[in-house]
A protein has these predicted regions:
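C-terminal, well-structured catalytic/ligand-binding subdomain of enzymes
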Residues: 24-87, 91-123, 143-146, 152-374
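Sec/Tat signal peptide C-region and signal peptidase I cleavage site
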Residues: 17-22
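Charged, amphipathic alpha-helical segments
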Residues: 127-136, 239-245
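N-terminal secretory signal peptides that target proteins for export/translocation
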Residues: 1-4
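Sec-dependent N-terminal signal peptides
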Residues: 6-16
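Secretory/export targeting leaders with adjacent low-complexity proregions
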Residues: 130-150
């Protein structure tokens, strides 16, 4: 009886908080990548856990650079990352995969949630196949309902739809999508009657990527993360009404970060926004640079600017989600600083990062000037 109540409580809490855990993602094969290696994109939404930073960690077989909670422990909270071997991993929450029974639930441990799976993968695995072996070994000890996007230096790239007692692998090479694939907050292996409202974001990105000519560059995904396009309403910023349905667009009130992982064995790297995609800038970080990470994403500056933007741009009245579109339009009009991401770690990484922080400081000043008018 106690176990049944525990499971019921967990399901209820999951239902209540799922909206805040939603994300949008895509993976790209080497032949469609401007970098010649797999790309992984995660647009992270999480209204509860917004306090993150970019960190270099060497607590296992392989060192890695990852998005982690602003704490001293990472075993439950890696949100995206890439290790020194070029293995990259991202995830999105999913709600239509099989649930464990009360009896099976006893064998699952909360320490194996999606953040823990990614933490273990980055520190222990060099290839997709090694990550798959990790999933097999943790089959009866994990508590995870996630879509994991994974790429490695060999060029292999796939989604793993993972639940407590099983998983299914979807290689991009067999997806039929011309070198890419997309996931939001449902799984193809799950119940087709429970796709949820995130299907709108899935359809949007599938459409925009299908229409894209040529290869995909990391900046293309930053653009997707800053676009208020929707399938049903077009660009919602073109309508002056305050009301909008947040699940129709990629950026939302709950947006807390954007990460494009480059699975390059010679120079593993990421393009990151540690904050809302509208108010932030995209910053390159390199695993080979170790702990030399731009302070604007290693510290609090970008995240705090994001919080201030969110307060001005989003609100809710009588359960209706409202968007101050003039705030969003005004911030989007601010020209993003030109930010190159070299395919080799810069020789003078200190000067490289110092310039990034200088550019962000100027950007932050411009954004705050705009926000002060509202």
């Amino acid at each position: 009886m106690i176990m049944k109540r525990l499971v019921s409580l967990f399901v209820l809490l999951a239902a209540l908080t799922f909206e805040s855990l939603a994300c949008t993602s895509a993976i790209v094969a080497p032949q469609r990548s401007s970098e010649g290696v797999p790309l992984l994109w995660k647009h992270r939404d999480n209204a509860r856990y917004t306090n993150t930073r970019i960190e270099y960690i060497s607590d296992g077989r392989y060192a890695y650079t990852a998005v982690v909670p602003n704490t001293e422990k990472y075993d439950k909270g890696v949100y995206a990352g890439v290790n020194e071997k070029g293995l990259g991993v991202i995830s999105t929450a999913t709600k239509n995969l099989p649930e464990a029974t009360p009896e099976e639930y006893k064998a699952c441990t909360l320490s194996r949630m999606s953040g823990g799976v990614m933490w273990n993968a980055l520190r222990k695995c060099a290839t997709i196949d090694e990550l798959e072996e990790l999933l097999k070994k943790t089959k009866r000890s994990r508590r995870s309902h996630s879509n994991f996007g994974v790429g490695d230096a060999s060029g292999a790239v796939a989604y793993f739809e993972v639940w407590d007692l099983g998983y299914r692998r979807y290689d991009v090479s067999t997806s039929g999508n011309n070198g890419f694939d997309v996931r939001s907050n449902f799984s193809h292996a799950g119940d087709p009657k429970k796709l949820g409202s995130s299907k709108r974001r899935y359809d949007l990105i599938m459409k925009e990527m299908a229409e894209h000519k040529g290869n995909f560059a990391p900046q293309n995904f930053i653009d997707y993360s800053r676009s208020y396009n929707s399938i049903k309403y077009g660009n919602v910023l073109d309508d002056d009404s305050y009301y909008y349905c947040s699940n129709h667009t990629v950026p939302r009130a709950s947006t807390v970060g954007v990460f494009v992982v480059v699975c390059d064995g010679k120079c593993p790297r990421m393009l990151v926004m540690n904050g809302h995609s509208v108010s932030s800038i995209a910053v390159p970080v390199y695993v080979q640079a170790g702990s030399n990470i731009p302070e604007c994403v290693h510290g609090d500056a970008m995240r705090l600017l994001s919080n201030d933007f969110r307060e001005k741009a989003y609100t809710s009245v009588n359960k209706k989600k409202l968007l101050n579109k003039e705030v969003v339009r005004s911030v989007l009009r601010i020209k993003q600083p030109k930010m190159d991401m070299p395919k080799e770690t810069p020789v003078d990484i200190h000067a490289f990062n110092a310039n990034i922080d200088k550019l962000f400081a100027k950007h932050e000043k411009r954004v705050r000037k705009v926000l002060s008018k509202f």
